[in-house]
Amino acid sequence: MTSARWLVRRGIALVLALAGAATTGQTLPDKSKDKTLGVVNCASSLCHGSIGAWNGSPVLQNEYVVWSRLDKHARAYQLLRNEKSRRIAANLALPQPAHQSGICLDCHAHNPTTPAAAPHALADGISCEGCHGPAERWIAPHTAPGASHRGNIANGLYPTDQPLARARLCLSCHFGTSDKYVTHRIMAAGHPRLSFEMETFTNLQPAHFKVDADYLQRKGNFDGVKIWAIGQAVAVATQVDILLDPKRGRDGVFPELTLFDCHACHHPMADTRWKPHTAFGKSISPGLVRLNASGMLMLRLILRQTDAALGERFVQAVLQLNQAVAGSGDITERALAVKALADEAAKKIAGTGVSNDNLRGMALALVDDGLGGAYADYAGAEQAAMALGSVVNTLHKLGQLPSAANLNQGLANLRAGLVKDEAYAPADFQARLRAFRPLVAAPLAKP
């Protein structure tokens, strides 16, 4: 690639970064100019450090206790002191150990760019302010009489309740940004493969909030399918951001390989998985590394159910991007087209959501796409299984699917086919999907 092309891409990267910030109008917590004050300011028993939840309070007031005792984010820093982290740091020849290296601390702790003095401590891991934003401006007024959630956000509180903002925040570590990213080199040094789906991961964390009437009045309600769909759209846009970023999108003469399907390379030579067609049309040539299309597969399916015209434009844009990756076409132009459509989809879903009338069709499409061969790669199957969990759970809550026990057993059977990514067998996963389909297709018995 010529230096002139790199200069163009540097300008594009800046535009993309600014566009990402504009999506929510809020700076990510680690980039805020406000001062971080430390967890201790939240931990009083009269604030958020109560052993048990309070009755009659607008918040539970035991948030610190739940986080510190049960949430893995609180222990993220401690992982940097274990043997695996020491080995990764040594393999990367880092000048400092993992627990002192910014490349690790940026996602294993709240490591703000604005200097933070004690009592803030990196050892607190992903602390309160790591998600809710540095508290310099909002900590005093947020407890004052008449304080509002909107006012707190204006004072720097990060709006984690809003799916678009939450997706940007979570993906900044669980996928990456131009400033912090788990590269192929870091994975080769021993870091686990990253996987993320916003609705599933949100529910896996111990909730330090209760969605009651007061919560709904202050923050609104977002169903799981909407959160899942927005997360997928933002993930696709984030992937394209990294692909285009001159700092993160390449590593020497190679592209950044974590953006591509891991198992296109990491499988036995005798296991020939290349197919002439994919969900996005004619496949690129054998022997070429494929983009990780797992998020794109999910967004394609979502748009087919919510906006067919936008969905068709997205399919064509991804097909053209894949062709550009193979050397036919301008990759920058085509990647920007995919990002623009993903951003459009995220905003549309945030505004209108997903109709309950489309949910059963969406669940069936998740299954039928797999039966049609769309999940030839592990990452696609993994996302489909998590998506089915979100959609089926919502359908059951709506009374449109019976027997929670059977549904849970069916979902567990799907997950059992995904325990080891290296052992993933597409035909086996298809068989599991085939067994699951009747649970989704069966009409409710009439009373």
Residue ranges: model-predicted function:
Residues A19-T24:
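N-terminal signal peptide c-region/cleavage motif recognized by signal peptidases
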Residues V39, S44, A109, G125, ...:
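Aromatic-flanked redox-active Cys/Sec active sites in thiol-based oxidoreductases
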Residues V40-H48, L105, E129, L171, ...:
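Cys/His/Pro-rich metal-binding microdomains
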Residues D369-P447:
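A cross-kingdom marker for long, charged
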Residues T27-P29, I51-A90, P119-S127, P134-E382:
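Primarily the internal scaffold of c-type cytochrome electron-transfer domains
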Residues T2-L14:
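Bacterial N-terminal signal peptides that target proteins for export
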Residues A90-E129:
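Post-signal peptide N-terminal segment of secreted/secretory-pathway proteins
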